[in-house]
Amino acid sequence: MFFTVVLYSDTINVSYELNPPKIVKGERFDLGQLKGNIQEMTNRASQLRGLVSGIHLTDSVLGVPRLSSVTAARYIKEHIDAEARLSCSIRVRDRNFPSLCQTVSDAILIGAESVLILMGDEPADKLGDSGLRPSSAVRMLKKEGYDLNIKLDLSFPAKVKDKSAQSIRNKLNVTPHSLVSQSISSLSDLGEIVDLAKPYGIKVTAVVMVPSEKNHQSASLIGLDWSEYESNPVDFIRQAAKMAHAVLLTSPNSFASGLQLLQQLKQ
């Protein structure tokens, strides 16, 4: 099973983000290569046992086609741990409402604890936008009763520049189970998100990117400044976990760095 990380007398809720493998590498689909990459993903999931409270599977980050988050979750359930606590991102940019319902139903059937409904990055070919938006999607899913069977979460900016912005109000008014931040750079920004969510009874998950050399490019791509915690990410994560309901650790370009930080957290 996957266990909550225990630090001294405190228990914190830390999950880890895994990217499912790309479906196509190069220009052609290669089933043998895909199966090998799935094995690598499940091996990584196995290494996380005892270090995290759960695993979050992403959905085609940067618009690059990958194995679906729900299919990836099924592989982990079947081959690593049937009791693993898993959550899945679901992009709405590529889905209409019937397609979304199918995917959320699949997530429920494989035993995922939650789904993170997000817009998703624009695909490289820049083709296709279903017109569905995350807040509207959650509202429709709740109307259909999906929230009685799985937690419905929404993505949220790491820093709120305008609390009265319609996009912010929409996310709060639909009252998802949790708001999952983009990668945070400061505890003060996280505190503002928690304060916004609290009156609505919404939980907050703080996403923290591992400050490693190999993740610099990813940080630059999203404008993340990790100077506040680069020298001491362990304490930063501990503090974030006290403020928020949970922390989701991401290390997009270095699994080894993420694993090392998780091991430090457990000491």
Describe each region flagged by the PLM.
Residues 12, 237-266:
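C-terminal extensions of enzymes
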Residues 12-20, 53-57, 84-90, 115-117, ...:
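Hydrophobic faces of well-ordered beta-strands that scaffold small-molecule active sites
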Residues 114-182, 188, 194, 198-220:
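Conserved anion-binding
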Residues 201-245:
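Catalytic-face loop-and-helix region of soluble metabolic enzyme cores
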